[in-house]
């Protein structure tokens, strides 16, 4: 069985999303959980890449890093005002179910 996608949630993502993913057996870390609170976006993205985790964020700065050519393990991006927690959770579960880490590498999924 291929390796599943793993996620890293930045500090602005609601903790209920991490809880929902974990309840479904999906590997997820959070900024607070790995002591990266206050880290720069570049440091967050480097951590996620080193751990082969897709970065989940609403922060446009990650899109700019992608445009600048900064390598990453994938970005799942959404605007918080456009999606409910349940919608974001369902979208991440779908990404986890149908995409591989290789398919997400240096790719952005807009939720």
Task: Describe every region a protein language model picked out.
Residues 1-11, 15-24, 36, 42-45, ...:
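Acidic, PIN/NYN-like endoribonuclease modules and their adjacent C-terminal/linker elements
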Residues 49-66:
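Acidic, metal-binding active-site segment of PIN/NYN-like and related structure-specific nucleases
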């Amino acid at each position: 069985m291929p390796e599943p996608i793993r996620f890293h949630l930045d500090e602005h993502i609601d903790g209920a999303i991490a809880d929902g993913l974990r309840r479904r057996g999906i590997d997820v870390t959070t900024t607070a959980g790995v002591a990266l609170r206050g880290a720069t976006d570049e440091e967050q993205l480097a951590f996620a890449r080193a751990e082969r985790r897709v970065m989940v964020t609403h922060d446009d700065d990650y899109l700019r890093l992608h445009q600048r050519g900064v390598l990453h393990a994938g970005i799942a991006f959404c605007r918080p005002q456009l999606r409910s927690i349940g919608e974001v959770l369902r979208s991440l579960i779908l990404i986890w179910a149908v995409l591989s880490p290789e398919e997400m590498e240096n790719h952005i999924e807009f939720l």
